[in-house]
Amino acid sequence: MNREERLKRQERIRNFSIIAHIDHGKSTLADRILEKTGALSERELREQTLDMMELERERGITIKLNAVQLTYKAKNGEEYIFHLIDTPGHVDFTYEVSRSLAACEGAILVVDAAQGIEAQTLANVYLAIDNNLEILPVINKIDLPSAEPERVRQEIEDVIGLDASEAVLASAKVGIGVEDILKQIVEKIPAPSGDPDAPLKALIFDSLYDPYRGVVAYVRIVDGTVKPGQRIKMMSTGKEFEVTEVGVFTPKPKVVDELMVGDVGYLTASIKNVQDTRVGDTITDAERPAAEPLPGYRKLNPMVFCGMYPIDTARYNDLREALEKLQLNDAALHFEPETSQALGFGFRCGFLGLLHMEIIQERIEREFHIDLITTAPSVVYKVYLTDGTEVDVDNPTNMPDPQKIDRIEEPYVKATIMVPNDYVGPVMELCQGKRGTFVDMQYLDEKRVMLIYDIPLSEIVYDFFDALKSNTKGYASFDYELIGYRPSNLVKMDILLNGEKIDALSFIVHRDSAYERGKVIVEKLKDLIPRQQFEVPVQAAIGNKIIARSTIKALRKNVLAKCYGGDVSRKRKLLEKQKEGKKRMKQIGSVEVPQEAFMAVLKIDDQKK
């Protein structure tokens, strides 16, 4: 192809993604677009075609982003090339969203005609605005009896400030309005700007590991072209590779001769090491490299940490391999080895949030068949010592000695909660119970309110989301962003079993709620830990001070069964002998802690409600 043909082709490319709150119909709309452009035959279409992972289909959510190339014949006879990049809607996966938006020029904003704007809609729209994308509002599900398209249109204008007069009214389920959406994509979304003759610049926005071809990098070409046989260089590491194959997804991978400006596709270059293709890195030509890399993504810091240990310690290396493979296409996962006296060898893993943690855990158990024990999630605390040094603590067992601590700061988040009027009371109560401070409250319309609170992240990590949903019968939606660290009065609580600290059960808690929490945990553990032959005290302690205790009663055999009648001193002798034996057992006996006990420490709040 000569330069002219390339530029002509470039003008007909449209790169866009679909953004929406969970359940507003994003994946269904993607299905309709695939169907309308003839990317898949009727036979191949299944619901949520782009959600390839079994877990995604089961939970009905999108976790990974996915890219597809489609061809669309417009009314004017021109053939356009669409690249649709599907994005997740859940708050834990905003990073995935920001990655897919960086590879686009436009975004379709899907809003449910019955529910209106939700918290995550807002979060994702702001990401799109930051990336200077052209946003096309679509009001979906207009076939529902409860749909109020006009109210939602007004809401889009008032809350986001987008002009919604030309918003498409659609129903992805029945296929209404899909043609209009395709028409708007052609008319409103700009073609990619890039120079086909400049040195190659390609953004890696995802990657996955293929046992036969090595690492497969998903790329968006910004400048130049890439074809097999070309030497490429990673700009962050400076490593060089030779391209072996390039292709596009139509949803299935299809090999092509070259990828040009604006294309979204994949390339393989016999890259064996997972670490060499960092998501967000720029690929350039090794012979004539680009002057500077593309502005990458911001470095992602995990917010929530927990320990993961294989139940069978011999599978420690399998777990490491599993985590490495997952990390390859999940840039936000972070892990390092750690050991625990109670659980043996394992890893300390960092996640973006609780859903992220749950999904990684489930993927390890499903895809790699490793049974896991996970410890209570914790956040990163900044601990300032009396000698002026500062330590980051993401594991309660690493907390320095209380005498050496000057102050502890914990991460706070700004929580945006959208909630129907009737539930404002319970939600405010919940936020205050979680040590939240009230910031702002706005009425979106006569039925819905937006509440903004500053809440410690550690309070959200446990079960804030579940509590919020149950307090509002599932109507509230919620989104949060980190706003920095603030000093708090925190203490580390240890749990002692039979006088021994169980390191995996330690956690950090606010001093005011320490006593309550200690009491609840001790009671709960008493029910969960199986009874032993001797009695076991369960204690909660702050430093050396025991603040709560309960006792697991011993199992005992009836030693008097064989004495029919007989003298009382004979019975006493047998009882004394049993007591002696139990005492000896207690000195050498150890207690097994079941997995439920670790999870119980998290879910204590159930008791309080």
UniProtKB/Swiss-Prot annotation:
Its main location: membrane. Keywords: Cell membrane, GTP-binding, Hydrolase, Membrane, Nucleotide-binding, Protein biosynthesis. Gene3D superfamilies: 3.30.70.240, Elongation factor 4, C-terminal domain, Elongation Factor G (Translational Gtpase), domain 3, P-loop containing nucleotide triphosphate hydrolases, Translation factors. Its EC number is 3.6.5.n1. Residues 11-193 form the tr-type G domain. GTP binds at D23, H24, G25, K26, S27, T28, N140, K141, I142, D143. It catalyses: GTP + H2O = GDP + phosphate + H(+). One of its GO terms (molecular function) is GTP binding. It is found in: Cell membrane. Required for accurate and efficient protein synthesis under certain stress conditions. May act as a fidelity factor of the translation reaction, by catalyzing a one-codon backward translocation of tRNAs on improperly translocated ribosomes. Back-translocation proceeds from a post-translocation (POST) complex to a pre-translocation (PRE) complex, thus giving elongation factor G a second chance to translocate the tRNAs correctly. Binds to ribosomes in a GTP-dependent manner. Belongs to the TRAFAC class translation factor GTPase superfamily. Classic translation factor GTPase family. LepA subfamily. PANTHER family: TRANSLATION FACTOR GUF1 HOMOLOG, CHLOROPLASTIC (PTHR43512:SF4), TRANSLATION FACTOR GUF1-RELATED (PTHR43512). This is Elongation factor 4.
